[in-house]
A protein has these predicted regions:
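Short linear sequence motif anchored by a di-proline
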Residues: 1-90
């Protein structure tokens, strides 16, 4: 699975999760607060089994589902990634 992040300064980072650390895969990954993120299965796989733990605690007041149009307006340089990760969203 690959995690795609857009930080508050607009930097896009892709992190590949997996067991092969010699191929720079990571077995776990931390996404910082305030970062937009999404993920997709790697080539050759059709799904990923994922868990997401939040700390110190989760409050829906702090949650915001990304809007395709708003994200593209804010980060037009990442149009292709945003479009792929927000399929089916307005």
């Amino acid at each position: 699975m690959t995690v795609v992040e857009i930080s508050t300064d607009g930097t896009l980072t892709k992190t590949t999760l997996g067991q092969d650390v010699l191929q720079e895969q990571k077995v776990q990954h931390l996404v910082k607060a305030g970062t937009w993120f999404g993920s997709f299965p790697n080539n050759g796989t059709t799904y990923s089994f994922v868990g997401c733990t939040v700390a110190p605690g989760f409050d829906f007041c702090d949650f915001q589902l990304g809007s395709r149009s708003k994200l593209i307006d804010e980060y037009p340089q990442h149009f292709k990634d945003i479009e792929m990760l927000t399929e089916g969203l307005p």
